[in-house]
């Protein structure tokens, strides 16, 4: 497929902005997991879990999945029949971070933003050494959609930003100001680029994300917008837990800020599962290579905040039988009128993320 050339200018100059996740969606995109140096059991448990996530999303939203050519037969045998499989090379399966960020305008037009990608840190803490295929994913998706794209001069993953669609952007300094992303840019310069490419006007900076999150503290595991003026925050009451100070600091910031419209924020506290750790059984057959090794006893960055909003559905990870029910009940309160669907998601967590990380919504144009 001949790739389109990037558009000149920026989305903001052209009247485009990133809508909130609860805006109507035409589709959700995913990628096929196959790396045996990241996913256990030859990636089969992860593939089965991705299929369950896709099935849940597809009840309300069409699902498309990028699949490398050599795995197409396996994907066809595993994925629900109503999921559209698209031949596409990738280095791993994190569509939130490698896929396009879609922007829209008031005239029912949609375009894509292609960020630069360096596998969560490049040679300074990145999670694998070769990410050339991942760099091409966003434009392949936008070309498939026949949407023009902008090429943003910023290393950024989709999981590191959340917006309310009304001018406010939520993020973490731990990730966006990390020297392994854009060391040549200061905070003001990064904010200007986000204004230009997402159409936002106001920033809420949390210092840190979830403890031991190997993405360097992505916001989508820590805090997200529920609707304008309301956020969900990953929370623990255990003062001995290293997460406690992070959540308290975030709560302080959120309690003492306003959004782009001048609203004080309502804060929902979503309880942390666990703490959760991976086991010898879950790590012994993960191959060693140039990727970050998986070893038993590592604390997993499990979080119920890592859910997807898609067309009046909430797809959230089931992670711990002790807290899954509480998370479900809170999500019912947070999203009245939505279908709340839990999917067992430990296999995704073992690979370093969760449901929001493996999905990327395509807003309706």
Swiss-Prot record:
Assigned EC number: 3.5.3.12
Gene Ontology terms: biological process: putrescine biosynthetic process
Family note: Belongs to the agmatine deiminase family.
Disulfide bonds: none
Coiled-coil stretches noted in the UniProt entry, renumbered to this chain: none
Presence of keyword Ribosomal protein: no
Catalyzed reaction equations: agmatine + H2O = N-carbamoylputrescine + NH4(+)
Name of the featured protein: Putative agmatine deiminase
Organism expressing this protein natively: Yersinia pestis
Lineage summary: Bacteria, Pseudomonadati, Pseudomonadota, Gammaproteobacteria, Enterobacterales
NCBIfam families: agmatine_aguA (TIGR03380), PRK13551.1 (NF010070)
Active-site positions on this chain: 357
UniProtKB keywords: Hydrolase
Broad EC category: hydrolase
InterPro entries to which the protein is assigned, alphabetical: Agmatine_deiminase, Peptidyl-Arg-deiminase_porph
One Pfam family matching this protein: PAD_porph
PANTHER family noted in UniProt: AGMATINE DEIMINASE-RELATED
Sample GO molecular function, one term: protein-arginine deiminase activity
């Amino acid at each position: 497929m001949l790739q389109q050339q990037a558009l000149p200018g920026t989305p903001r100059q052209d009247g485009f902005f990133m809508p909130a996740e609860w805006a109507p969606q035409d589709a959700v995109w995913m990628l096929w997991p196959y790396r045996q140096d990241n996913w256990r059991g030859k990636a089969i448990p992860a593939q089965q879990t991705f299929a369950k996530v896709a099935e849940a999303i597809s009840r309300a939203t069409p699902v498309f999945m990028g699949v490398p050519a050599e795995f197409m037969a396996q994907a066809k045998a595993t994925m629900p029949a109503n999921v559209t499989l698209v031949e596409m090379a990738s280095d791993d399966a994190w569509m939130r971070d490698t896929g396009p960020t879609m922007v829209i305008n008031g005239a029912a037009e949609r375009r894509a933003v292609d960020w630069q990608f360096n596998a969560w840190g490049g040679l300074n803490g990145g999670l694998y050494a070769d990410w050339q295929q991942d760099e091409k994913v966003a434009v392949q998706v936008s070309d498939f959609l026949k949407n023009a794209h902008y090429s943003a001069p910023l290393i950024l993953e989709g999981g590191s930003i959340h917006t309310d669609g009304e001018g406010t952007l939520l993020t973490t300094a731990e990730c966006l100001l990390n020297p392994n992303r854009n060391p040549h840019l200061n905070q003001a310069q990064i904010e200007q680029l986000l204004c230009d490419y997402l159409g936002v006007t106001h920033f809420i900076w949390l210092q840190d994300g979830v403890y031991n999150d190997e993405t360097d503290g992505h916001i989508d595991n820590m805090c997200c917008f529920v609707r304008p003026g309301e956020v969900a925050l990953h929370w623990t009451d255990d003062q001995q837990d290293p997460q406690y100070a992070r959540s308290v600091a975030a709560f302080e910031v959120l309690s003492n800020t306003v959004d782009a419209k001048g609203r004080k924020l309502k804060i929902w506290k979503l309880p942390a599962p666990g703490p959760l750790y991976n086991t010898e059984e879950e790590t012994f057959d993960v191959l060693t290579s140039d990727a970050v090794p998986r070893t038993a006893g590592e604390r997993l960055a499990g979080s119920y905040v890592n859910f997807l909003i898609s067309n009046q559905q909430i797809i959230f990870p089931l992670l711990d039988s002790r807290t899954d029910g509480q998370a479900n009940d809170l999500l019912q309160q947070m999203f009245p009128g939505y279908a709340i669907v839990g999917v067992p998601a430990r296999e995704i967590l073992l690979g370093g993320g969760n449901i929001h990380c493996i999905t990327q919504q395509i807003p309706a144009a």
